[in-house]
């Protein structure tokens, strides 16, 4: 990108990416993890070169290598605005029981349609009761709902400790399995 306070700069719009997955991915039980980074500091300049690299890498993984790709993106609309998710088969939007979250999900669905994302699903998150479930379900009737993740102090504690929450609580496992089962019913394979 550019440096703070400077203009322009040139970056390659078709960077070579074919060696990135094999060179930088961490592999565990056949699953490769590739951490793509984030914006390092406020006012750091244009993020266009990084977005171009990401789009090229995704195109390479999906089209040339025919790999299944899961993106865990930061909350917000930036990736949709930059087109990083263009052409994806499916997008899962995590929705909390509140009007701002519901409105954001509606906006995400519109942006996803602009990018020809084929399916947009939702998962209710931090749900504490039936009223929370109804708020999400009734607020987003046009979405395919995959399931709910309960508000759970085990997740908060795991985050504080820098641990994965999945193995800490059986309820978490059940809820994740339910989401996966519903995703498969909708035609998205594991």
Q: Which role does the model predict for each range below?
A:
Residues 33, 68-70, 164-165:
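Residue-level preference for the first positions of well-ordered beta-strands
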Residues 40-49:
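Flexible beta-alpha connector loops of hexameric P-loop NTPases
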Residues 175-190:
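C-terminal alpha-helix
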Residues 49-148, 156-157:
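Conserved catalytic-core segment of NTP-binding enzymes
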Residues 30-40:
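Short, basic/glycine-rich phosphate-binding loops at helix/coil junctions
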Residues 1-29:
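N-terminal phosphate/diphosphate-binding loop that engages ATP/GTP or pyrophosphate donors
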Residues 36, 150-151:
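Active-site donor-binding loop signature of nucleotide-sugar glycosyltransferases
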Residues 159-172:
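C-terminal boundary of histidine-terminating zinc-finger modules
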């Amino acid at each position: 990108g550019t440096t703070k306070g400077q203009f322009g700069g040139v970056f390659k719009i078709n960077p070579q990416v074919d060696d990135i997955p094999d060179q930088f991915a961490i592999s565990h039980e056949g699953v490769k993890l590739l951490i793509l980074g984030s914006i390092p500091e406020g006012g750091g300049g244009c993020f266009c070169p990084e977005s171009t690299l990401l789009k090229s890498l995704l195109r390479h993984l999906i089209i040339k290598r025919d790999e299944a790709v899961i993106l865990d993106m930061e909350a917000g609309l930036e990736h949709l605005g930059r087109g990083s998710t263009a052409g994806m088969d499916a997008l899962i939007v995590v929705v909390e029981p509140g009007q701002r979250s519901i409105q954001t999900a509606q906006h995400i669905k519109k942006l996803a349609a602009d990018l020809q994302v084929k399916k947009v699903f939702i998962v209710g998150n931090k749900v504490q009761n039936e009223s929370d479930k109804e708020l999400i379900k009734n607020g987003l009737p046009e979405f395919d709902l995959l399931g709910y993740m309960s508000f759970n102090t085990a997740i908060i504690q795991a985050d504080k400790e820098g641990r994965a929450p999945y193995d800490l609580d059986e309820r978490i496992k059940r809820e994740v399995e339910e989401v996966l089962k519903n995703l498969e019913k909708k035609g998205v394979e594991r």
